[in-house]
C-alpha cells in the first residue's frame, strides 16, 4: 500500500466511525477480530448518535466525495437490498461538484483532438454548462457547419481516483462479507462489483457515444424519442462531441403546462418507450432520471422525449425477457404458482427450492396489492417485492435485472408525475400480450426454427459422437468432484486464517504510523509496527497456493 492509499483508508475509517457506522452492525455477528480492530481506533467515537442509520450513511458518502456519492446513488436504487427509509435517504445525494478550470478543460480537449480547439470549433465557452463528478460540459459551434454542439470531457485524473476508491471499497466489502457471513442479504462484495462495472463504463465516453448512436438509430423517425446526433469522428475515450438540443426538463411541470403539452400522451408514451426498448430492441437506457430527460418544445399536442447521457445501458437475454413478461402476466392473473415456477425455470432461484413455500411467500407479498385498483399498481413495486421475496430463497439478482428494476421505477414515477391517472397495466398489457404471442405462439416457434435450422442441419451428423463424448465426460466429472471439493475446503480454511492475520497487521501498521506522526512514545509506535510486520509475514506465508481445480 502506498502512503496515499493508507491516508485515504484512514480517512474512510475515520469518517465511518465518526458517524458510528460500526454500531449499525448487530453485536451478535461481530467476531473477535472485528472488536479488536474497533479497539485500535479507540479515539474515534460516534459524534452523531441522534441521527438514524440511513442519514448517517448518507452523510458518510457525502463527506467522502464524488465516487462515494455515486455509489450511494446506486445503492438508493437497490430497494431489494435496503429498507425504503435507507434508500430514500441515499436518493437525496446530489452529484454536484465544483467545475475544474476551463484552461485545463481546453488542454484535455486538445490532447484528445491532437490539435487546437480552434481547428474544429468557434465560440468555445469557457464557462461550463454543467459539472459532475465524472465529467464537465462546455458548449461551442462547429466550424464545418456552424451548428451548436456540446463537448463532454472527463475530469482530470478521475480514472486514478475512481480506481483507488474502488480498491478500498472492494477490501471493505470483502471484510464486511466475512463479518456478516456470505449468506447475508446485503451481499456487499456483489454490490461493489456491480458498481465497478457501472462506473468503469461511465469512464469510457467513446462507449457512451456508441450507445447513443445505437439508441438513436433504434428510434429514428419514431416520433417518441430523440437522441442527439453524435459527431463520431470527434468522439474519444475522454471526449465526446454531440449536437446541442433545446428542450424542457421533464421535471419542469410549470413549463410543460405553459406550452400546452399533452401530459396524458407524454406519460403513456414514456411507458411504451420503456417496453419497446426492453422487449423489441433488447437495449434500454438505464439512467433515465429527470436530469437526463427533456421534452420537445415543438408539437406540444404530440410531444416526444429527448434522451441524454447513454453511459449506462441495459440488455437482457431472450430467456430473461420471456420470463419477465410471463411474470407480469401471471401476477395480474394472480397465478402465484406460475410465478414460483418461472423463478425456478429461469434459474433465478435454485431448482432445489421448495416451490410450495416459495409460492406461499409470493402470495403473502402480492395478494394485498390487489386491495387497490389495477391502475394504482406499480410494475416496479411488483418486481421489487418479487425480488425481495426471492432473495429469501437465495436468489442472486443479476446486474441487468437491477438496472431494469431501477429504470422501471423511474419511468413509473415519471409517468404518474406527468399524469396521475395513468393506468400502467392498460398501457403495457397489449404490448406484453402481443410480444408473448409472437415469441411463444406458432409465429414465434416458426421464427425460432427458421433461425436455428442452419445450425442444427450442420451439427446433425456429429450428434452420435457428441452424445458419446458427453456420457464419458459425465463419468469423469463425478469421479473428480469429491477430490476438488476437499481441496477447495482446505484452501478456504487457509485463506480465512491468512486474511485475519493480514487485516490485523495492516491495522497495527497504520496505528503505528499515526502514533509516530503524533509524536507518541517510540516503543508504542515501533512496537505496533513491528508486531504488524510479524503478523503480515505470518499471514503471507500462510496464504494458500493458487491451484487449478
From Swiss-Prot:
NCBIfam families listed in its UniProt record: PRK04750.1, UbiB
Function field: Is probably a protein kinase regulator of UbiI activity which is involved in aerobic coenzyme Q (ubiquinone) biosynthesis.
GO BP annotations, alphabetical order: regulation of ubiquinone biosynthetic process; ubiquinone biosynthetic process
Pfam families: ABC1
Domain (Protein kinase): residue spans on this chain: 123-501
Family, per entry: Belongs to the ABC1 family. UbiB subfamily.
Transmembrane parts of this sequence: 498-518, 520-540
Main location class: membrane
Keywords, in A-Z order: ATP-binding, Cell inner membrane, Cell membrane, Kinase, Membrane, Nucleotide-binding, Transferase, Transmembrane, Transmembrane helix, Ubiquinone biosynthesis
Organism: Shewanella woodyi (strain ATCC 51908 / MS32)
Protein name, UniProt field: Probable protein kinase UbiB
Annotated coiled-coil segments of the chain: none
Pathway membership: Cofactor biosynthesis; ubiquinone biosynthesis [regulation]
Lineage of origin: Bacteria, Pseudomonadati, Pseudomonadota, Gammaproteobacteria, Alteromonadales
Catalytic site positions: 287
Amino acid at each position: 500500500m502506498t502512503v496515499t492509499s493508507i491516508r485515504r483508508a484512514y480517512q474512510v475509517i475515520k469518517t465511518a466511525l465518526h458517524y458510528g457506522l460500526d454500531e449499525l452492525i448487530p453485536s451478535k455477528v461481530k467476531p473477535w477480530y472485528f472488536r479488536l480492530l474497533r479497539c485500535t481506533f479507540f479515539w474515534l467515537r460516534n459524534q452523531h448518535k441522534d441521527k438514524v442509520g440511513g442519514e448517517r450513511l448518507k452523510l458518510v458518502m457525502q463527506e467522502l466525495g464524488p465516487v462515494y456519492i455515486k455509489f450511494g446513488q446506486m445503492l438508493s436504487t437497490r430497494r431489494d437490498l435496503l429498507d425504503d427509509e435507507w434508500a430514500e435517504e441515499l436518493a437525496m445525494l446530489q452529484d454536484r461538484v465544483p467545475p475544474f478550470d476551463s484552461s485545463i478543460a481546453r488542454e484535455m480537449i486538445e490532447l484528445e483532438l491532437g490539435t487546437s480547439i480552434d481547428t474544429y470549433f468557434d465560440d468555445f465557452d469557457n464557462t461550463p454548462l454543467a459539472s459532475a463528478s465524472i465529467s464537465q460540459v462546455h458548449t461551442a459551434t462547429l466550424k464545418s457547419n456552424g451548428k451548436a454542439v456540446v463537448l463532454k470531457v472527463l475530469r482530470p485524473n478521475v480514472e486514478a481516483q475512481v480506481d483507488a476508491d474502488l480498491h478500498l471499497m472492494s477490501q471493505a466489502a470483502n471484510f464486511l462479507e466475512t463479518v456478516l457471513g456470505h449468506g447475508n442479504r446485503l451481499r456487499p462484495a456483489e454490490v461493489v462489483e456491480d458498481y465497478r462495472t457501472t462506473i468503469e463504463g461511465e469512464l469510457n465516453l467513446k462507449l457512451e457515444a456508441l450507445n447513443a448512436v445505437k439508441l438513436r438509430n433504434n428510434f429514428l423517425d419514431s416520433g417518441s424519442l430523440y437522441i442527439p446526433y453524435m459527431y463520431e469522428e470527434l468522439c474519444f475515450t475522454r471526449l465526446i462531441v454531440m449536437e446541442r438540443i433545446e428542450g424542457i426538463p421533464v421535471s419542469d411541470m410549470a413549463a410543460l403546462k405553459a406550452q400546452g403539452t399533452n401530459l396524458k400522451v407524454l406519460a403513456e408514451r414514456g411507458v411504451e418507450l420503456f417496453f419497446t426498448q426492453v422487449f423489441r430492441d433488447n437495449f434500454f437506457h438505464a439512467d433515465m432520471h429527470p436530469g437526463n430527460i427533456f421534452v420537445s418544445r415543438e408539437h406540444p399536442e404530440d410531444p416526444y422525449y429527448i434522451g441524454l447521457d447513454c453511459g449506462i445501458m441495459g440488455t437482457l437475454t431472450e430467456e430473461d425477457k420471456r420470463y419477465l413478461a410471463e411474470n407480469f402476466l401471471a401476477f395480474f392473473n394472480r397465478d402465484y404458482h406460475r410465478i414460483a415456477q418461472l423463478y425456478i425455470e429461469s434459474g433465478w432461484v435454485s431448482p432445489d427450492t421448495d416451490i410450495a413455500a416459495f409460492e406461499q411467500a409470493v402470495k403473502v407479498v402480492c395478494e394485498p396489492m390487489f386491495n387497490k385498483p389495477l391502475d394504482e399498481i406499480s410494475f416496479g413495486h411488483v418486481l421489487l417485492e418479487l425480488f425481495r421475496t426471492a432473495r429469501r430463497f437465495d436468489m442472486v439478482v443479476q446486474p441487468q435485472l437491477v438496472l431494469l428494476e431501477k429504470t422501471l421505477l423511474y419511468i413509473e414515477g415519471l409517468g404518474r408525475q406527468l399524469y396521475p391517472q395513468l393506468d400502467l397495466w392498460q398501457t403495457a398489457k397489449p404490448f406484453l400480450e402481443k410480444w408473448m404471442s409472437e415469441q411463444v405462439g406458432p409465429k414465434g416457434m416458426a421464427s425460432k426454427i427458421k433461425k436455428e435450422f442452419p445450425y442444427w442441419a450442420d451439427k446433425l451428423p456429429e450428434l452420435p459422437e457428441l452424445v458419446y463424448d458427453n456420457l464419458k465426460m459425465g463419468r469423469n466429472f463425478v469421479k473428480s468432484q469429491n477430490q476438488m471439493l476437499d481441496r477447495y475446503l482446505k484452501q478456504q480454511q487457509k485463506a480465512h486464517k491468512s486474511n485475519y492475520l493480514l487485516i490485523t497487521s495492516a491495522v497495527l501498521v497504520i496505528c503505528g504510523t499515526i502514533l509516530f506522526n503524533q509524536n507518541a512514545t517510540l516503543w508504542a509506535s515501533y512496537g505496533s509496527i513491528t508486531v504488524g510486520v510479524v503478523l503480515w509475514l505470518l499471514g503471507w506465508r500462510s496464504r494458500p497456493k493458487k491451484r487449478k481445480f
